[in-house]
């Protein structure tokens, strides 16, 4: 998939590029039965307090119902369309099953309109097919990996993501994640064959602040530019040092390199090698 690089006709266009969607998108309107609308929360919780900063505004979006479980076993499905989804970096493939049901899945690299995919233990080792890890050969590239059997895929779902099945030992399979982490997952967990599509996503240059605003992302103000009442880094004359042994969050907690993972987490025993 190609990238369109704009000519510098204005300051905002000078460093901007976009994906050439015409090369891959085959349908512009989503399947009506598989979308719903949701109120914008702008980073607020049910009490109206900001729990995630720098969120708000942005273009209206419809939520697509995506099948991460791939639990419709033994029934072949034909790819009807490849669609854009504003809620994720990957594209979606619209499947039409032999019994007439339609579902969205994350579109893997190489999946085209007219291809047939299937899920279940008896499915072939083919791009887009979903199987339990116990039925996938060692060395296979996989995505949309479950952490608990039947819960639905949670790992490797964004554009270009791919993991590798490294080994099988007893009830568990060893997988290598894009972060470099090696971890065990139950062999009953399902994964989809192949790599998530839209590999060029990482090469797109946003180019201007306005494009981030369209995405619903607001500006991030540096703590050193604030007053002392607003941030531990604030205050001082001119560009003053932060005045602490290390950088702090707006709430006074250590940050930038500070480990935030819970100690003695139950899943620690499944992680062979931590992420880089």
Swiss-Prot record:
Keyword Transport: no
InterPro entries, per the entry: NA-bd_OB-fold (IPR012340), Rib_uL2_dom2 (IPR014722), Ribosomal_uL2 (IPR002171), Ribosomal_uL2_bac/org-type (IPR005880), Ribosomal_uL2_C (IPR022669), Ribosomal_uL2_CS (IPR022671), Ribosomal_uL2_dom3 (IPR014726), Ribosomal_uL2_RNA-bd_dom (IPR022666)
Extent of Basic and acidic residues compositional bias: 265-276
Annotated stretches, region: Disordered: 223-276
GO CC annotation: large ribosomal subunit
Keywords annotated in UniProt: Ribonucleoprotein, Ribosomal protein, RNA-binding, rRNA-binding
SMART domains referenced in this protein's UniProt entry, alphabetically: Ribosomal_L2 (SM01383), Ribosomal_L2_C (SM01382)
GO biological process: cytoplasmic translation
Single GO molecular function: structural constituent of ribosome
SUPFAM superfamilies noted in UniProt: Nucleic acid-binding proteins, Translation proteins SH3-like domain
Pfam families: Ribosomal_L2, Ribosomal_L2_C
Protein family membership: Belongs to the universal ribosomal protein uL2 family.
Binding partners and assembly: Part of the 50S ribosomal subunit. Forms a bridge to the 30S subunit in the 70S ribosome.
Job of this protein: One of the primary rRNA binding proteins. Required for association of the 30S and 50S subunits to form the 70S ribosome, for tRNA binding and peptide bond formation. It has been suggested to have peptidyltransferase activity; this is somewhat controversial. Makes several contacts with the 16S rRNA in the 70S ribosome.
Protein name, entry field: Large ribosomal subunit protein uL2
Organism: Caldicellulosiruptor bescii (strain ATCC BAA-1888 / DSM 6725 / KCTC 15123 / Z-1320)
């Amino acid at each position: 998939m190609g990238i369109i690089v704009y000519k510098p006709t204005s300051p905002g266009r000078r460093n901007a590029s976009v994906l050439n969607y015409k090369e891959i998108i085959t349908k512009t309107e989503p399947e009506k039965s598989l979308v719903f609308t949701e109120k914008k929360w702008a980073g607020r919780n049910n009490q109206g307090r900001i729990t995630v900063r720098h969120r708000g505004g942005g273009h209206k979006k419809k939520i697509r119902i995506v099948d991460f479980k791939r639990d419709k076993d033994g029934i072949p499905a034909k790819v009807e369309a490849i669609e854009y989804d504003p809620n994720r970096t990957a594209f979606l493939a619209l499947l039409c099953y032999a019994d007439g049901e339609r579902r969205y899945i994350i579109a893997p690299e190489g999946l085209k309109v007219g291809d047939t995919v299937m899920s279940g233990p008896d499915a072939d080792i083919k791009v887009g097919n979903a199987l339990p890890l116990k039925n996938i050969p060692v060395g296979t590239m996989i995505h949309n990996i479950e952490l608990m059997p039947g819960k639905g895929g949670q790992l490797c779902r964004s554009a270009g993501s791919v993991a590798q099945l490294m080994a099988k030992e007893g009830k568990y399979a060893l997988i290598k994640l894009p972060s470099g982490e090696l971890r065990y997952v139950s062999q009953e967990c399902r994964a989809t064959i192949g790599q998530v599509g839209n590999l060029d996503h990482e090469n797109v240059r946003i180019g201007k602040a306005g494009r981030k605003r369209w995405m619903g992302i607001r500006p991030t103000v540096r703590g050193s530019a604030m007053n002392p009442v607003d941030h531990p880094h604030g205050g001082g004359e001119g560009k003053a040092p932060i005045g602490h042994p290390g950088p702090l969050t707006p709430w006074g907690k250590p940050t930038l390199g500070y480990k935030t993972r819970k100690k003695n987490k139950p899943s620690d025993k499944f992680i062979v090698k931590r992420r880089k």
